[in-house]
Amino acid sequence: MPTENERNAKYMTTADAKATQEAKELLEYLKNTAGQQIITGQHTQTIPCEEIAYIRQTTGKEPKLRGFELLAYSPNINYADASPECLKEVEENKGTAEMALKWAIEQRKNGNGGILTFTFHWFSPLGGRDKSFYTEHTDFDAAKILQEGTPERAAFYHDMDAIAGILQQFQQEHIPILWRPFHESYDTWFWWGAKGAKVARDLYRLMFDYYTGEKNLHNLLWVWNSDIEEAYPGDEYVDVVSIDVYLPEYQSTDYADAYEKLVAATSRDKVAALAEVGYLPDVDLLQKSRIPWAYYMTWSKEFCIGEKYNSVENLKKMYDSEYAVTL
């Protein structure tokens, strides 16, 4: 019988030394896919998952990777001082974690191998109004989280505990998650990036250490989402490096420039992903260039549905391509 070290030798090293077998296998799959094919992905944030229905109706297939949103699970939503738009978004997002769990279990039973990722628009742990994940709607100071004994730090850990409880349900079912906290920390529009990218980096490290060390969450693959070199948490904290790209207008692209900028600022030894895009990459260009994006994820609603951003022709081209991994 092979030893545990011998069994692990065939896998890419995970940031979490105690990562579950399923997480190790997922990371290895991503590594082996990158540059050979690209995994199709689509974000959703409501129970109906209208984006998936649209893709199925248009192409006859579904994305291999499905993104889910956790914003409604933020413990500190200020319902008394929220716009109708905010309240609608929260209401529509309720129940999506439970739906994600059900979907992932079904994927395993059916042998389809669908991949799950979470995005978390985290309402500020203290104070704030309306969509308080936006810096403009909260005076929450992320830098104070890094100081022992502050109310900000206590609230941060309180919220982390709440979200950990959700993630643990997936671990109990042996479901790995591409976990992308503190996304888009290269800018200041979210409170976790408002005090600079290095603060966001330190929050990411804090969460990694707490979730892997104290909460015993080992089903997560840790996705870093920034291309600022001085803010990179370090290889020991990261499984996947990623970037979000929203071009001002459509162009046929394999996002090669974004890839080079990302890996130059982070690591060429990690799996790389287009964690969010507005416009689909050109699958024909990708097949020629073999830029090693493991996956992409188109954003939700109008970025997927209709032809404001992605034409039916381009959507079909992606999902019909032998280079694209679909369900």
Protein language model annotation of sequence segments:
Residues K31-N32, A53-K61, E98-G113, Y134-H137, ...:
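Acidic (Asp/Glu)-rich catalytic clusters
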Residues M1-V90, L285, Y323-V325:
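N-terminal module-boundary/linker segments of secreted carbohydrate-active enzymes
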Residues N76-L206, L217:
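Substrate-binding cleft of extracellular glycoside hydrolase catalytic domains
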Residues I38-Q42, K64-F68, G114-F120, I177-P181, ...:
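Hydrophobic faces of well-ordered beta-strands that scaffold small-molecule active sites
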